């Protein structure tokens, strides 16, 4: 497991793409044509804990699947930007909504539509299997592939930096 080289105690918010980050890059299709996604339970645990501990979490995705909205809303995520055609606009809306600076935001993306946000946020991160163009912009490349724990990786490191990871109330 590698460690993020950044003062993580400064991070107040994390934003994530879904496809290729919080779900794998393979998207099975339901017979109706609706894309289906798998999600990582450990990513989910870390995200809901971060919400409970007061960090701002956003989902910024080009997808519009109702199942994705339901999943992340159930984890307590309030800032869901679905159908995001130009992600930088939604990133800035999220940042400005909470009066954050770019240096206080970690963003994790995996493909070309994420690059503009990654160039603006303070801590651009990506999964191990991100495209080369994204890896060249990332300050941290997770040990895990998309949909296989890369979200947990970065959330856990941020919570540890804030002294919130294994706090007594992390168990209930």
Name each region found by the language model.
Residues 1-18, 164-172:
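Non-catalytic pre-domain segments flanking phosphatase-related domains
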Residues 47-71, 81-82, 118:
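Substrate-recognition element of Asp-dependent hydrolases with the DxDx(T/V) motif
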Residues 22-53, 62:
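A positional/architectural concept
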Residues 10-12, 55, 103-104:
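Short coil/turn segments at beta-strand junctions that form active-site/ligand-binding loops
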Residues 33-40, 74-75, 79-81, 88-172:
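Mg2+-dependent phosphoryl-transfer enzymes with acidic/Ser/Thr/Gly-rich catalytic loops
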Residues 15, 54, 63, 76, ...:
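Conserved functional loop/turn residues at catalytic and ligand-binding sites
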Residues 9-26, 118, 151:
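Asp-based phosphoryl-transfer active-site loop
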Residues 18, 62-63, 84, 128-131:
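Short secondary-structure boundary segments
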